[in-house]
C-alpha cells in the first residue's frame, strides 16, 4: 500500500490525526497489519523503547549497580524476545544517528521515539555508531548461540558506557 493511501485510511478508519497517521504509515512501509500493530498500546516496541532508554541513561550516568539490575530483568525474557529487543536497539541506533541530519524523510520514528532521540541523538556519531551497532549484532549472535544472557547483556552494557563517550 502506498504511504499516502495508508495515511488516508488511518485518518478515516482509525480517526488518527494527520501527523500520527503519517508517522505510522511511514513506519509500516506499506504493511497494513504492521500499521495496526503500531497502534496497539501494549505494543512490544514500547517495552523495548523503555529498555533502550533505561540502558542508555544508566550507561551515561555510569550506574553499574543499576545496569546489573537492568541485565537481570532482560535475562528473564525468552531468547527470541531478547533477539527482537536487540533488533529494536539497532533500529533506534540508526534512527538516532539519522536524526542528527535533521531530515524528517530519513527518519522512521514514532512520536515517543523521536522525543527520546531529540536529546539522545547527539551522543551517536561517526566515532561510535559502527562499534555500537557491531556490539548489538555480536550480542544477538551470542544469544542465538545459547550464551548466558546475564553475561552477554552486562558485558554489552559496560561497553556502551565507553562507546557513548566517544566524540
Regions found by a protein language model. Give the residues of each.
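Charged, glycine-rich active-site and insertion segments that engage polyanionic ligands
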Residues: 1-88, 92, 99-106, 111-167
Amino acid at each position: 500500500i502506498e504511504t499516502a493511501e495508508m495515511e488516508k485510511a488511518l485518518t478515516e478508519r482509525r480517526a488518527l490525526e494527520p501527523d500520527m497517521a503519517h508517522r505510522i504509515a511511514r513506519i509500516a512501509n506499506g504493511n497494513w497489519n504492521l500499521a495496526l500493530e503500531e497502534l496497539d498500546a501494549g505494543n512490544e516496541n514500547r517495552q523495548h523503547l523503555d529498555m533502550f532508554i533505561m540502558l542508555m541513561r544508566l550507561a551515561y550516568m555510569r550506574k553499574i549497580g543499576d545496569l546489573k539490575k537492568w541485565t537481570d530483568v532482560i535475562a528473564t525474557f525468552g531468547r527470541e524476545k531478547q533477539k527482537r529487543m536487540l533488533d529494536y536497539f539497532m533500529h533506534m541506533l540508526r534512527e538516532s544517528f539519522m536524526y542528527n541530519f535533521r531530515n524528517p524523510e530519513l527518519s522512521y520514528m514514532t512520536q515517543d521515539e523521536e522525543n527520546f532521540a531529540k536529546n539522545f541523538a547527539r551522543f551517536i556519531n561517526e566515532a561510535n555508531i559502527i562499534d555500537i551497532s557491531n556490539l548489538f549484532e555480536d550480542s544477538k549472535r551470542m544469544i542465538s548461540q545459547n550464551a548466558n544472557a546475564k553475561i552477554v547483556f552486562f558485558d554489552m552494557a559496560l561497553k556502551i558506557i565507553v562507546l557513548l563517550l566517544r566524540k
